[in-house]
Every structure is written in C-alpha cells, then in structure tokens.
Amino acid sequence: LDAVICSEVLEHVDSPQESIEELIRVLKPGGILALSVPRYLPELICWKLSNEYSKTPGGHVRIFKHNQLKKLGTINGLEYQNFHWAHGLHSPYWWLQCLFWKTKEKSFFVKQYHKFLVWDLMKQPLLTRVLEMILQPMIGKSLVMYFRKPI
C-alpha cells in the first residue's frame, strides 16, 4: 500500500509493537504511515476524572507520550516526517463524559456538548474553525504522526 492510516487504535491493543510491524509489512517502500492516538495530557485528564474510563472493556489500555509514539516508529526503521494535533474542540467533550461517567449520554452537559460538536462538524462555521486551530496546540485530543518507510 502507498499509504496506511492507523487512527485511534494503538491505545487499545495489547502489543503496539506487533501492530506496527504489521502496518509496516503492508506498506510499500517509500510509503507513508499515519498514526493517531489520544494525546497525553487530555487523555491523562480523562483517566484522572474517571476511574472507570481506563477500565472499560476494549477501551484505552495505555497513554502515549509524543516521544513514545515517535520512538515506536523509528525503532522499527521508519523515518519520522512530522506531527500535528487534532480535535481541539473534542477534549472538553471527553472530560464531560468522564466527569459524568455514570450518566454519560443522559447528562445534560454531555448531550449539549455533543450537539455542539455535531453542529460544528456539519456547519463548520468560521468561528469554531478558528477556535479549533487555537485550541489544538493546547488541548487537541489527538496526536497525529507521520512516518515514511525507507526505499
């Protein structure tokens, strides 16, 4: 494959190393691998707000720091290219989910913020696009990293 995307998966698996090996196996030389995982600080806040969050079956079993994800790629022979943060508006939603863990979707605050995110996704108004760009470096929910498989 010329490009492989592994989005929000590695935090769920028992062996990220085995997963990376398989992703590299199917990637052509010169191909690009894009990895995204929950960003360390926003994810840590989720773990602190709710003891149940990290214990959910099939849920997140680890939190990656920037350098850990970068090392996972480079020790497997990939060339690090770049990174960015994403989903600056999404961290508060997950914090609300964790804060109101027992009632989650029934919580007024969770429901209202979810409506806001759906509205933003569908309408993409300039105000929230700018707000998202401002928030991403501070509280972006996801870390997205790009690697290249050597030729």
Predicted regions located by residue number:
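Conserved SAM-binding loop
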Residues: 1-46, 66-73, 145-149
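Short, solvent-exposed loop/helix junctions and linker helices
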Residues: 13, 63, 137-138
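Secondary-structure boundary/capping signal
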Residues: 17, 31, 53, 80-81
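A generic fold-level signal
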Residues: 32, 56, 138-140
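Acceptor-substrate binding/catalytic loop of class I
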Residues: 51-68, 85-86
